[in-house]
């Protein structure tokens, strides 16, 4: 047991498998609507960033005049970017909730977490065949997940960041771990519903633990040991018994009024298509809302003695349980984390202030004006540190834009996170993506899954269903007198299922700059699909584009 953490009188540690007593059963219910912030969260489309979503019958908002007909010629000219549309503001202040949770549970630093990484990966040639990669780019590093993560239908990897984003010198803690962090979203659940008679449907003996909407987990990879560890992201709240608790990340509670089934999804998760680790903060893209922010100094440890079969005492006099995979937060005076040892609570929300455009987004349609989508984010350290944020769009289904990108000074974002409710962070630049070029009988410049900006040039990862994606390059220029991104006519074949981008600049460790990404598709999705992390030498990428 962790020294110094002694249970209160009458709260002795118990075997992890012991069921809650009838006395405890009336206390601390399953999380519900009481956990949501006053201003709520908007839902994203179920098929967010899915190349196959939509029917091709999208419609535009009345406020936009551009054509919405599907097809290559629908967007003949780039749309201008409007930086004002990207403005963010700090939402409901939850610092008091985080303080209460901080006092209730023990914590673990990231350096120690890296030393206790428990899941082995494969590295370089041990990953086997490299069939998911195209012929244009030489892959420099490869990392393969443990088999259950490589094949999981529940968890789908999306976003990537690392220590090069976190610190200029790339030196985190006392180890040589040089952590890389990958976020994945829960793709397999109906979740629960407050409005159904069987609100506790996911707790039934017959229910799989995959029933719950677990939200987002982050996997921290130790490059020195090739081991990694999962951390579940959570949302702090006061439950109906006025006790501090936490729930998995989601947008809103569903409103199924009958039995909760897969066709009546109870909860709406978030996609986490992009992530930036900057200093102590982890920024996670929330497509419909903006960004969720987490603090790496607040990683809570539900199993500090590393003995899963024994409940550990917590500073608040209760115990924690990492065996039960169906429960989350404080329930019946026991702390749970869906079986995960580590949970990290959200500390702030940065929400878009601009109203949504009125057009449909069910098929990943995008629009030239109004609130953007936070589909992916990355960090540019070339000059003054900036976050780059962009949209995934599918013009085959309509809309009036192939996507927009904007940049924020990191100093403004940090000030908003640490400031009072309403503190804003404004984009200082915005562009619409290039148009005109074609690929596979459709527009080239859409279906963007990741972006990075490096030494003045922009690099985009374009997906292509269950086939090789493309790495694209664009340069700021002038088109018809307006400042816009001009696409390079050359494209580079990338991996199957390409996702977010992360640039490890190498200024601290002396290595050549690496452009990292990841593939999302499990082998069950297609014959050649495979999940890997991989990097290209950035110098070779630049040279290959000419």
Regions found by a protein language model. Give the residues of each.
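Structural signature of eukaryotic scaffold interfaces centered on beta-propeller domains
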Residues: 152-176, 267-278, 366-386, 444-445, ...
